[in-house]
A protein has these predicted regions:
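Acidic, Mg2+-coordinating phosphoryl-transfer loop and its flanking beta/alpha structural elements
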Residues: 123-166
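Structural recognition of alpha->loop->beta junctions
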Residues: 69-85, 154-176
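Active-site neighborhood of HAD-like aspartate-dependent phosphohydrolases
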Residues: 1-47
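Short phosphate-binding/catalytic loops that engage adenosine nucleotides
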Residues: 44, 81, 139
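Short, electropositive alpha-helical surface patch
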Residues: 58-73, 98-110
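Conserved Lys-Pro-Asp/Glu-containing loop-to-beta segment of HAD-superfamily phosphomonoesterases
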Residues: 98-131
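Short acidic, glycine/proline-rich loop/turn micro-motifs
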Residues: 16-20, 58-59, 154-155
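Substrate-recognition element of Asp-dependent hydrolases with the DxDx(T/V) motif
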Residues: 32, 36-69, 84-95, 134
Length: 177
């Protein structure tokens, strides 16, 4: 089984400092949906791992988060792909939960669900917390320069062996070719 972990905001869709609070605000980054379809055609199981603290902050509710994810699922399917699962942390940063990236709880849940360790599994993100959570589990951290990725790269201090690509489409081209 080929598994790949993708952050959502800034990797699949455009991010916003004001959060993605409705399905209308969810807009895919050009090439990302087709990239997910290519992964599926290459027999990858695509798993989204995303912090969604807007729920914990009261900016939107679970119904709205599910509607956003439903829109994403439909858009990916329309492009010929499939997201196997979405794991998310709904807690605000001050909740001190174990599932919020950069902590490893969400990644541990994914490993348990798929009955595997994540050693070497590609984990694509645009923030240091995405890359740190991946590295803690032995996954391969991959930074994309979309979303907050360029700022993350400029700030430095990336986990050892982090790969850097312009966007998800470039990551997928590297993986499947």
């Amino acid at each position: 089984m080929n598994l790949i972990l993708l952050d959502r905001d800034g990797v699949i869709n455009y991010d916003s400092d004001q959060f993605i609070k409705s399905p209308e605000e969810w807009k895919p980054i050009p090439g990302s949906l087709e990239a997910i379809a290519r992964l599926c055609q290459a027999d990858y199981r695509v798993v989204v791992a995303t912090n969604q603290s807007g729920v914990g902050r009261g900016l939107f509710d679970m119904y709205t988060l599910n509607a956003i994810h439903d829109k994403m699922h439909k858009a990916v399917a329309q492009a010929g792909g499939r997201i196997d699962a979405i794991f998310f942390c709904p807690h605000a940063a001050d909740a001190n939960c174990s599932c919020r990236k950069p902590k490893s709880g969400m990644m541990e849940d994914i490993a348990t669900r798929y009955n595997t360790n994540l050693k070497g599994v590609p984990a694509v993100g645009d923030s240091l917390r995405d890359l740190t959570a991946a590295a803690r589990m032995g996954a391969q951290p991959i930074l994309v320069l979309t979303g907050k990725g360029a700022k993350t790269q400029a700030a430095g201090d990336l986990p050892e062996d982090t790969l850097i690509y312009p966007d998800l489409a470039a990551v997928v081209a590297m993986l499947v070719e």
